[in-house]
Amino acid sequence: MTDQRPSLEIRLCGPRGFCAGVDRAIQIVVLALKKYGAPVYVRHEIVHNRYVVEGLQSRGAIFVEELHEIPAEHRDQPVVFSAHGVPKSVPADAEAKNLFYLDATCPLVSKVHKQAMRHQRLGRHVILIGHSGHPEVIGTMGQLPDGAVTLIETVEDARSCHFDDENNLGFVTQTTLSVDDTAGIIEELQARFPNLSAPAAESICYATTNRQDAVRSAAPGCDLFLIVGAPNSSNSKRLVEVAEKAGARMSMLVQRAADIEWDRIGDISVVGLSAGASAPEIIVDEIIDAFKARFNVKIELAETTVETENFLVNREIRDVELTVQDMAFVNGEHRVVGIPKLMPKIIQGK
């Protein structure tokens, strides 16, 4: 019987999905649960993805907004800080409450914290390029005293900002920003403040840059570009913007296959597909399956680089072994209930 489904090319971007920092953060919660038992408390979403959060909840993690929400009878259980980083006041509060905590801050976010503190130590007022209210921005600003950091969100902000000492300024950036948009803000700041000091190393992380490069490469000629990610995921929203600017006719952010607006899509022959750094691979598979149910799909890999970065987990939990099923869950390849769909792609101790 002839296949009557229309043909569709899916350009599957690589790299996509979980980065080393997200892998590490999820591992920390899983390892803590295995070593200390449930419940393990997590301050804020460990990463911006409900699928991951719900999977960890099913294993015994309890998510809270602030430390005072942890019941007195559970104060001997560990609490994990999210991958986005926290202000200095949070670990200080944990110590005051005699809580045992594990910091899952991405090492690349911690690097930005150190860059900001170095600027201040050298007598510079710190300019932070980022999005107001994002947990990473709150964490970075919370490394320094009130008034020591000015947040710049747009080129317009860069044009209108003023400082008491324009010769002693240094900037850092949120790690998940659009590379192109950030370049425009930095260019404007450098034009206005020629003595502006840059960080010793790039603030935007390798995973953000790599995912944007892959989307930029795949987008021209796409009728539709889907980005798997949460609405509160900064790096995922930037990928939607990159796809549109790079030539995709339409770009959408979806959390699950059920979010795809089939009626809005219309006639399509080429679809781009990528995932933000906190989106699990199993949802990418789910979306491909949804297209296969409607189209005769041909998948083309649009890979621009291969990532090999690995980050160690906290010393306190390195003695715990993960099973194959644990590792598949950490990699986003494992449904909350059931057996692993794919073999793991990480090494324990990463």
Curated annotation (Swiss-Prot):
Residues noted as binding dimethylallyl diphosphate in the record, renumbered to the chain: H48, H84, H134, S233, S234, N235, S278
Name of the gene this protein is made from: ispH
Cofactor requirement: [4Fe-4S] cluster
Family: Belongs to the IspH family.
UniProt KW keywords: 4Fe-4S, Iron, Iron-sulfur, Isoprene biosynthesis, Metal-binding, Oxidoreductase
Protein name: 4-hydroxy-3-methylbut-2-enyl diphosphate reductase
Lineage: Bacteria, Pseudomonadati, Pseudomonadota, Alphaproteobacteria, Hyphomicrobiales
E.C. numbers: 1.17.7.4
Organism whose genome encodes this protein: Brucella anthropi (strain ATCC 49188 / DSM 6882 / CCUG 24695 / JCM 21032 / LMG 3331 / NBRC 15819 / NCTC 12168 / Alc 37) (Ochrobactrum anthropi)
HAMAP family linked: IspH
Pfam family membership, one: LYTB
One function term, GO molecular function aspect: 4-hydroxy-3-methylbut-2-enyl diphosphate reductase activity
A single GO BP: isopentenyl diphosphate biosynthetic process, methylerythritol 4-phosphate pathway
